[in-house]
UniProtKB/Swiss-Prot annotation:
PANTHER family membership: 54S RIBOSOMAL PROTEIN L1, MITOCHONDRIAL, LARGE RIBOSOMAL SUBUNIT PROTEIN UL1M
Keywords linked to the UniProt accession: Repressor, Ribonucleoprotein, Ribosomal protein, RNA-binding, rRNA-binding, Translation regulation, tRNA-binding
Gene behind the chain: rplA
Name used for this protein in its record: Large ribosomal subunit protein uL1
Protein family: Belongs to the universal ribosomal protein uL1 family.
Quaternary structure, from the entry: Part of the 50S ribosomal subunit.
Taxonomic lineage: Bacteria, Bacillati, Bacillota, Bacilli, Bacillales
Matching InterPro entries: Ribosom_uL1_bac-type (IPR005878), Ribosomal_uL1 (IPR002143), Ribosomal_uL1-like (IPR023674), Ribosomal_uL1/biogenesis (IPR028364), Ribosomal_uL1_3-a/b-sand (IPR016095), Ribosomal_uL1_CS (IPR023673)
Length: 233
C-alpha cells in the first residue's frame, strides 16, 4: 500500500470509516477532507453485486448530470454530409471522417468523447484496438452511435457522463468539483444513483448496490448511506 502524506492522514481522522453517512453529510466531509490545491473532482464509486464476466450482467450506459461535471468535454464526431453540418452546428469540437481516423492512428487524442453515425462505424471500427482500451469507442448503449448527432453533442456538452462496470464489479463516475454547491453535488449524485438502479441486470442476484463511496481527487473515501438519497425507484 502506498505511503500516505501527512495531510491525507489528517483528513482521514475526520472520517468514521465504520459509518455510512447521509448524502448531505458525506458531501460536507468530501469538502473538508479535500487536500488538493486545485479544484478537485468529486467521484462516486459503486460496488455492485454483479458478475461482469457474464454477458447478461454487464452494465454500461450514460446519464446527463443536471449540473454538469465542471468540465466541458471535447467532442469528436465521425459523420459526413448533412450529419457533419448538424454536429458542427451543435458545437462539436472536431467533425470529419478519414482524416481523423488517420490522426488517431498516428497518436492524436485531443478529445474526450467520440460520437459516430451508424454508417461510419465500419470505418471507425478500425480504431477499436486504439479507442477500446481507453474507453473511447462509440457505443449505442451510451448514445454515442446515433444519427441524432446534434442531440448527442448537446448532451455531452451539457454534462453527460458514461459509466461502465469494471472486472471487479465497480463503477466510478465523476459528479462535479469540490467548488460546486452542496445541493448541486447531491442532485448530480442522485441522477447517477438513479441511473445505476435502473441499469440493474435482470440476472443479478442478491444485494445489488453493496457499497457506495464518494471521494475527492486526492482525499479519502467516504461511505454513503444510499437510503438517504431521494430517487425515483
Amino acid at each position: 500500500m502506498p505511503k500516505r502524506g501527512k495531510k491525507y492522514l489528517e483528513a482521514l481522522k475526520l472520517v468514521d470509516r465504520s459509518k455510512a453517512y447521509p448524502i448531505a453529510e458525506a458531501i460536507e466531509l468530501v469538502k473538508k477532507t479535500n487536500i488538493a490545491k486545485f479544484d478537485a473532482t468529486v467521484e462516486v464509486a459503486f460496488r455492485l453485486g454483479v458478475d461482469p464476466k457474464k454477458a447478461d450482467q454487464q452494465i454500461r450506459g450514460a446519464v446527463v448530470l443536471p449540473h454538469g461535471t465542471g468540465k466541458v468535454a471535447r467532442v469528436l464526431v465521425f459523420a459526413k454530409g448533412e450529419k457533419a453540418k448538424e454536429a458542427e452546428a451543435a458545437g462539436a469540437d472536431y467533425v470529419g471522417d478519414a482524416e481523423y481516423i488517420n490522426k488517431i492512428q498516428q497518436g492524436w487524442f485531443d478529445f474526450d468523447v467520440v460520437v459516430a453515425t451508424p454508417d461510419m462505424m465500419g470505418e471507425v471500427g478500425k480504431l477499436g484496438r486504439i479507442l477500446g482500451p481507453k474507453g473511447l469507442m462509440p457505443n449505442p448503449k451510451t448514445g454515442t452511435v446515433t444519427f441524432d448527432v446534434a442531440k448527442a453533442v448537446q448532451e455531452i456538452k451539457a454534462g453527460k457522463v458514461e459509466y461502465r462496470v469494471d472486472k471487479a464489479g465497480n463503477i466510478h463516475v465523476p459528479i462535479g468539483k469540490v467548488s460546486f454547491d452542496n445541493e448541486k453535488l447531491a442532485e448530480n449524485f442522485a441522477a447517477v444513483y438513479e441511473a445505476i438502479l435502473k441499469a440493474k441486470p435482470a440476472a443479478a442476484k442478491g444485494t445489488y448496490v453493496k457499497n457506495v463511496t464518494i471521494t475527492s481527487t486526492m482525499g479519502p473515501g467516504i461511505k454513503v448511506d444510499p437510503s438517504t438519497v431521494a430517487v425515483a425507484q
